[in-house]
């Protein structure tokens, strides 16, 4: 790569992206109910106040940007709970906001990982997974990727796989890769 991103990779501490992504989600914050990280807060609110319009994560923390090797691309999720008439379970929907996306390198990963995250959170909160709306401010294809993308577009599509989770897992933090059923 000959881009600003490749310079970042050269500078970064081996194996670390700095204070981005997981680091930000794991920072404990004081709430009136006690200390929680962002994931714990989402789980708490979904279980205790599911119709709140304040259930979200945000990992674009300006005071820590200088310690991130890359600014977060996918930076916030907002959760919304609905109830379908005639059904007992609530439905968990989410909006994923992303400032930038390299369509070839990231799109499939982002869609899969955040869809799976939505499914895991829904199951842990005894809800059904609903819609994931993915908002990308700058979705781009680099010139050097055009031949590969043309090749991919020309291929015969296969049916999308069906993805399920082990229904026995009720604790978000107990999921393992073995609980993903494709």
Regions inferred by a protein language model and the residue ranges of each:
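Conserved helix-adjacent loop modules within structured domains
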Residues: 48-56, 60-173
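Mature extracytoplasmic enzyme cores
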Residues: 175-182
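Single conserved hydrophobic/aromatic residue that forms the stacking wall/gate
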Residues: 1-5, 9
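Cys/His-rich finger/ribbon microdomains and the adjacent scaffold used
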Residues: 7, 13-45, 52-73
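A generic structural signal for solvent-exposed, polar alpha-helical segments
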Residues: 2, 27-29, 81
